[in-house]
Structure formats: C-alpha cells, structure tokens
Design a protein with these regions (language model features):
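Iron-sulfur cluster-binding electron-transfer modules in prokaryotic oxidoreductases
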Residues: 1-164
Length: 164
C-alpha cells in the first residue's frame, strides 16, 4: 500500500484492519498536549468515533498519565539501569488488552513504537547488550503480545481512505 508515514514514525496503511474488523484501542496522553495544554478529550473523541473501535483506558491516563520516556532528552540516550520508561508504558497499555496504542505525539510514537517493536524508535535496538538496562517489554506483557503504536491522524486518514 501507499506509505503515509514521515520520519516521525506515524505509520503506514499496510496491514490496516479492514472495515468491520473490531479494534481495541487505548490512547496515550502525551506530556505536552496533555499535562501542559490540558487537551485530553478531543483525541479520545476522534479515536472513539472511528468505526469498530472500542476505546479502553490505561490505569494511568489524562492528568495522571506517565511519560513515554522521551521527556528531558531521554530519547537520545540509553538507560544504564532499571526499566526503560517506554517499556513500562507499553506493558501498561498491553494490560488493557488493546490491539493499538494511539497517540498524537511523534516523540511518543517513536518511544512507544520502539518498546513495542513497531518502529525503530530513537534508541538502539541492542540497548540490552549495553549493560542489560533494557527490560524486554514482550516478556513482561500479558500473553507476551504488545499493541501496535499508531498516530491518531494516521488512524483517521485510514478510515477516510476506506470510505468510513
């Protein structure tokens, strides 16, 4: 299919669920859009209005949501100990049973996509080889399945292209 992505990792239309396929989606509140600008409901309204989407909430959401891990320039360096923030957040998303984590922030898309294996992300893929700091989110998630990370705007575009 035609690639609708840019370098921010917004996604592509390949593998998009066809009309009628049920999709469980959880929304990740980005720090700047959410906590800084207090925009919480419009992205949820948009995602929830897409056909066949069931919107589910993570335990920490809206003003209590956790960062994706990119804040404070963390996107550009490897964690040297403990669990990567993005790994912890993607496991929280997986706990909802969601097929997709939707976000409206390119940094969050990259960080969470890296943790879920759905994009290259900002950090190297072999962070675990550099001191064992990278907890494998797949083994920590329920059933070992991680949700795909998608940009809200791309999800809307896909629905428009399907004529929904």
């Amino acid at each position: 299919g035609e690639d609708t992505t840019d370098e921010a990792g917004a996604g592509s239309t390949d593998g998009v669920p066809q009309a009628g396929a049920p999709l469980k989606v959880t929304y990740h509140d980005a720090c700047f859009l959410g906590r800084h600008n207090r925009v919480y409901e419009p992205p949820r309204e948009l995602v929830g209005s897409l056909p066949n989407v069931e919107l589910v909430e993570m335990p920490r959401n809206r003003d209590r949501a956790m960062c994706c891990g990119a804040g404070g320039a963390h996107a550009w360096f490897e964690e040297t100990r403990g669990t990567r923030i993005a790994d912890a957040r993607i496991v929280e998303a997986a706990s909802t049973g969601a097929d997709v984590v939707a976000t409206a922030c390119p940094f969050c898309s990259q960080m969470l996509g890296s943790a879920s294996g759905t994009s290259a992300g900002f950090v190297s893929a072999n962070a675990a080889d550099q001191g064992g700091a990278n907890t494998d989110a797949t083994t920590a998630s329920p059933g070992g399945k991680l949700p795909e990370v998608r940009d809200v705007a791309v999800m809307l575009l896909e629905a428009v292209k399907r004529g929904q």
